[in-house]
Design a protein with these regions (language model features):
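Distinct, well-ordered alpha-helical segments
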Residues: 132-141
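Conserved small/polar residues in nucleotide/adenosyl-binding loops
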Residues: 159-161
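Histidine-rich, glycine-flanked metal-binding segment
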Residues: 1-2, 9-52
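Metal-associated gating/positioning segment near the N- to mid-region
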Residues: 46-109
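Acidic (Asp/Glu)-rich catalytic clusters
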Residues: 140-148
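A metal-dependent hydrolase metal-coordination microenvironment
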Residues: 96, 103-119, 123-131
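Hydrophobic faces of well-ordered beta-strands that scaffold small-molecule active sites
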Residues: 56-58, 91, 121-124, 150-156
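Active-site beta-loop-alpha junctions enriched in small/polar residues
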Residues: 61-63, 67, 96, 126-130, ...
């Protein structure tokens, strides 16, 4: 258990200066003051600190991005520290323009790594190009059978004749 004392809490509306009790990784209660607990727990004084829900980033190139301008334009894969520093607790990863040197298998592996590190991580199957790269061989099967896959990444281009 963790007791956070004296935090300015937004959930997401402003609740004021409160104490917050976390049990088993979940918020148990938020009160003006929590004084007596049935068991010992870690206490964190958050005086002068702001406590907010974690942010969700629904478009993240967790295995890196870029690449459309040649190899030197590729960006590195995301590190857990980048999420923590920005208050992001939930991500949805996708490939983007580079479905050749990056793969949905690698994207799935990175999604699982982030989950194991404590982030709520999901992904979109597919990438630019047709047919769309998948894990199971079909986008609908990816969505149905792989829990971390929420949908498919599509990119459409218009050609004027």
């Amino acid at each position: 258990m963790l007791l956070v004392k004296n935090a300015e809490i937004y959930a997401p509306e402003y609740l004021g200066k409160k104490d917050l009790l976390i049990c088993g990784g979940k918020i148990e209660c938020i009160q003006d003051s929590i004084r007596e607990l049935p068991v010992e727990c870690e206490v964190l004084d958050a005086e002068g600190k702001i406590l907010t829900p974690g942010f969700l980033d629904q478009h993240v190139h967790i295995t890196g991005g870029g690449g459309e301008g040649s190899f030197h334009t590729r960006t590195p894969e995301l590190q857990m520290s980048e999420l923590v520093e920005n208050g992001i607790t939930t991500v949805v990863g996708l490939l983007g323009t580079d479905g050749i040197t990056r793969s949905v298998d690698n994207l799935y592996a990175k999604t699982r790594v982030l989950c194991e590190e404590g982030v709520s991580a999901y992904m979109l199957t597919g990438a630019y190009g047709y047919p769309s790269p998948t894990i199971t061989g079909e986008t609908d099967r990816d969505i149905v059978f792989v829990n971390e896959i929420l949908g498919v990444k599509l990119a459409l281009s218009l050609i004027h004749i």
